[in-house]
Amino acid sequence: MLVALVIKGTNIQSVDEYYLTHIDDIRPDSETVTISIRCDTVLSNLDDLDPALKQGDYIPSDGVILPPTEYVLRPGDTVFDILDRAVRYNKIQMEYQGSDENSYGSVYIRGINYLYEFSCGPLSGWVYRVDGEYPNFGCSKYELKDGQNIEWIYTCDLGEDVGCEWVGEETAK
């Protein structure tokens, strides 16, 4: 009888479920990072937007899917880990291709908030930057440090419209 009472009063959670319900437990000594998700470039390119996305609330009127939000940084966390945690916690749709499913060896973000690669023209898709810099490698390979700022930005022009200049194998601000 006692075992039944203990089990009934116990909330059994996976590690991910626990961390998602304790995501706001930021203490003064916590290492943190900030993440935001924006698609404001779409607002200037509505003629190119997939007609199915023009209906409903897929594109926020200000282009902000997730305002800058702070998350606890755990050892070994990557840009992808924080994105995954943020979209789960905020119930934002995301689809990605695993690192074992492509030739890049890193996770590839296909879509966020139902906005996918090519949803707003042939050069559109998701890019990320950390502390204002666009890395030239995948999000699951970028290990984060305390205090860094991650921005996921939807581009409609292969990054040019968001300040990313692709230069061969390197990228610049």
What are these model-derived regions, one by one?
Residues 1-173:
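Ubiquitin-like/PB1-type beta-grasp interaction modules and other compact soluble beta-rich domains
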